[in-house]
Amino acid sequence: LHALREVTSLTAAAAEGATWRQYLRLDDLVGLTSVGGDEFVEARRATARDVLIRMTNPWLTAEQKEFLTQPPLIALAQQIRNWAGGEVSIDTLAAFIERYESTNSNRDADAIAELRLRMKWSPDSQLQALGEELNRHYRNANMRIAVSSELMNRWIPPQEPVSAPVRSRIAGAEVRGQSQTETQITVRLLPDPTVWRFGLEAHGKVSSRTQSQTWPAKLRNASNMEYEVRKLMLVNRFGLHAFPAEANAEGDTRLLGVDSNLSAVPVIGSIVENVAREQHRQSRPRAVAQVKAKVGKEARERMDREAGARLAKVNERFREHVIEPLDRFALTAEPVDMNTTEERATMRLRLASEQHLAAHTPRPSAPSDSLASFQLHESVFNNAARGLELDGRRLNVAELHALLSQKIRRHAEAEPADLPRAAKVEFAAHDAVRVACHGDRIELILKIVELRHGRDSIRGVGVHAFFRPVVDGMEVKLVRDGTLQFDGAHLRTGPRMMLHGVFGKLLPKDQEMPVLTAKLSEDPRFAGLMVTQLVIDDGWLALSVGPATPERTAWRTRGVTTK
């Protein structure tokens, strides 16, 4: 590849040459150009695709993107597209799609995804267009989240009045006293067709009673200020962004009285008081301006400080509950679209790598009065299941229990006392784990090549566990429903008991998975709300929260249990 030599020379001269060389995997590309044979086709294809994806990474900075627009790099991308593509049979694609529509097999999904990638980097424009159609129809968003402004405002904890001492210097005088601040914080959604855009707004009042030490008397003052603080927030594909707060304060001060040791002295006391009042009148405009500036500055700093602390907690929870699980299961979260209206913020995501499919069935619509709604397609579970890396593996039950604990719960759980640790499980080479959302339940399917326990062995069996939703107020959880089911040849009583003895411990009857926690029902900020929709159908799990009324029940599938 001539372009590869030019890029190698270009990066050697660049300030970040070593980093670019590693990022673009130039050494790997050089190595693959020096070998031939069909046995290296897949290695070249995988490497070329990885490099092309890296070159179009949306996380690149503007400077990095500009570096990649240089002619040698454009030529390299064009040349390795030939490696990234491959032969495409439309008849084969049609057969895979037809079978996938009826079986939802992960193996068929992977085959369709592979053909899509070949078409994406094909030199044939018609195949490229067909690849885009596949991407649109079979890699649609598989997660949708919508949150209303009302719910965001419910989330904000009530602000208690704050009393604080006043120690300052205003208009050249030392001022001492006490102030009380009352604040109301609201969230205002700002319409935007491409991102989540909202403002934190604080409206507050500061009332103070102070004394200023001036010669020849002490002045007692009252101040009443009102302030507004606005802080712009953005959520886009790169994360959460907070802008500096802006503040404005208005108000006035008034003189309550003059105190002087000479007040009781005839004539002189009056003169002293008049002098003090005149000094106050002259300095009042400057004092009011300084008080306004001080109130605005403190409100602005308080908003930035408190919002910064809360956002740090949000980022930490987001990292713990979203980023880390995605990393554990080798998933990528790609926003398909985001938008904000005055009523709600909506985000559609695709949780999949380039090698995965995503949603391809119609998504349930949320009730129009929903304060929050959430829809999740079964492809999220199935793409995550690949991250378990169980296809074709053979391991004992103790190892399997530890692996599942680490992947799903991030820590090793204590084993059940009667876990058959030594039993060995060999999973199928394809579709070892699959999840289906249908018939009002979530079905977990395990394909087992062999289960061996001591001298006993069972081959070619499918394990089916079903989970149904249970609603209790604002709490929603999935519980295992009924007994485990098995399919396979010659499954008599003995083999079934053996299967129950192993998988009944890994998937216990009382197993529960929280969807919405009970804490929401106990939080007064969410009083008057209920689960208004819970649907599991056609590959989707859909959940909505909205206003509760005495006669209202959740719009749900018939298999939902309510308490």
Which residues does each PLM region occupy?
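Extended, low-charge, aliphatic-rich alpha-helical segments
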Residues: 1-157, 271-563
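Short charge-dense sequence patches
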Residues: 2, 44, 235-257, 414
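Interfacial loop/beta elements and low-complexity acidic/Ser/Thr-rich segments
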Residues: 132-199, 204, 211, 533
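Generic detector of short, locally flexible boundary/turn motifs and exposed helical patches
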Residues: 161-168, 196-200, 206-210, 253-258, ...
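N-terminal beta-strand/beta-hairpin edge segment
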Residues: 187-242, 417-418, 423, 431-465
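Short, charged/polar low-complexity linear motifs in solvent-exposed/disordered segments
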Residues: 216-218, 260-261, 560-561
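Amphipathic, rod-like alpha-helical scaffolds used for oligomerization/assembly
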Residues: 224, 230-239, 244-246, 279-282, ...
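Short acidic, glycine/tyrosine-flanked loop/strand segments centered on an H-E-D-like triad
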Residues: 244-280
